[in-house]
Regions:
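Extended alpha-helical targeting/anchoring segments
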Residues: 1-173
Length: 173
């Protein structure tokens, strides 16, 4: 196990991913949205004191590690952006979709949340199959997988709500 998280740049991240991939070794990767701060490491080497992940079938949460106490009551007040701010971003996305620059977009926006919970408490108690906590810097939790590797191929799947609702079995899919 490494003692501390070691982030690298885009080129080194690509090199590390190619190396692990060519050797058939599983690896964990985390990349910021501009690919300047990247983490590429074998899962068993990640220090659980700085990064925890819990995915179906893969986790580095030590067995028997106690969860943080769940407070009986807590403050959780989302502070979403205004409709006007959201609309400006949506209009940009819409313009680019119609311009042919993309065919699928996951338009997400940061939402501040005023809470008295720690990020670790959010990680421990989130009811989501995909969870990540990074050194009290941020936490991620999601109900869905976005990409899947099967038989050497990478597949992306539309998120719920993006399927054509007119398909005969849309509700079941």
């Amino acid at each position: 196990m490494i003692d501390t998280l070691s982030f690298c740049g885009r080129e080194e991240a690509i090199t590390r991913m190619n190396c692990f991939g060519s050797e058939g070794r599983p690896f964990f990767f985390l990349i910021d949205y501009i690919a300047e701060k990247c983490l590429v490491e074998e899962p068993h080497r990640l220090p659980s004191s700085e990064l925890l992940f819990a995915f179906p079938g893969a986790t580095n949460v030590p067995q028997g590690m106690p969860a943080t106490p769940h407070p009986r009551s807590f403050r959780w007040e989302p502070c979403p952006m205004s409709f006007e701010e959201y609309r400006r971003g949506f209009d940009i996305v819409h313009r680019h979709l119609h311009g042919g620059n993309s065919f699928l977009v996951n338009y997400t926006c940061a939402t501040l949340v005023d809470t008295d919970l720690t990020l670790r408490q959010v990680f421990d108690h989130a009811r989501a199959p995909y969870r990540l906590w990074v050194n009290d810097s941020f936490v991620v939790f999601s109900p869905e997988i976005f990409v899947r590797i099967t038989d050497g191929f990478i597949y992306s799947h539309p998120m719920k709500g993006t399927m054509d609702a007119t398909l005969p079995d849309a509700r079941e899919r």
